């Protein structure tokens, strides 16, 4: 039996920023080590409520830690008076991820939102 399509060689990296019952603050919200190599195909963001948030994703290698460089360039992720965001164009992003890279998530500004899910789809 022949397969009609090649296997889906993608992985989704999910990261949750949650401030609990308190207002979310700006700054470094944590780091995540990625264990696969691939290319980011899209980013999807869901928040707990309508509001505003701007954040950046940076990456580094284990050898270069703690120096990080933004992968979003001037195209930071931004929700404005909404609860969701999707981008599959990723203009000027650094989309290559190498196994062992470390991602950092920084909130630049926020209003109303207390919890946000960031999903990066990687093509392996």
Task: Identify the meaning behind each predicted range.
Residues 92-109:
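Noncatalytic modules at the cell exterior or secretory-pathway interfaces
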Residues 16-25, 29-31, 108-124:
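C-terminal interaction-tip segments
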Residues 39, 51-54, 99, 112-114:
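Short loop/turn segments at connectors of secondary-structure elements within structured domains
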Residues 1-24, 48, 54, 58, ...:
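Glycine-rich, low-complexity segments
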Residues 37-49:
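A short beta-strand element within beta-rich, extracytoplasmic domains
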Residues 85-93:
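Exposed aromatic-hydrophobic patches
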Residues 27-39, 93-95:
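Extracellular and analogous surface-interaction loops
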């Amino acid at each position: 039996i022949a397969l009609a399509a090649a296997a889906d060689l993608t992985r989704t990296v999910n990261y949750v920023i949650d401030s609990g019952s308190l207002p979310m603050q700006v700054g470094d919200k944590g780091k995540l080590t990625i264990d696969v190599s691939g290319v980011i195909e899209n980013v999807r963001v869901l928040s707990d409520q309508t509001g505003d948030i701007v954040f950046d994703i940076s990456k580094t290698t284990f050898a270069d830690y703690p120096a990080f460089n933004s992968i979003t360039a001037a195209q930071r992720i931004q929700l404005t008076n909404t609860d969701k965001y999707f981008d599959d164009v990723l203009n000027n992003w650094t989309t290559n991820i190498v196994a062992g890279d470390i991602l950092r998530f920084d909130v630049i500004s926020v209003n109303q939102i207390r919890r946000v899910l960031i999903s990066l789809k990687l093509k392996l």
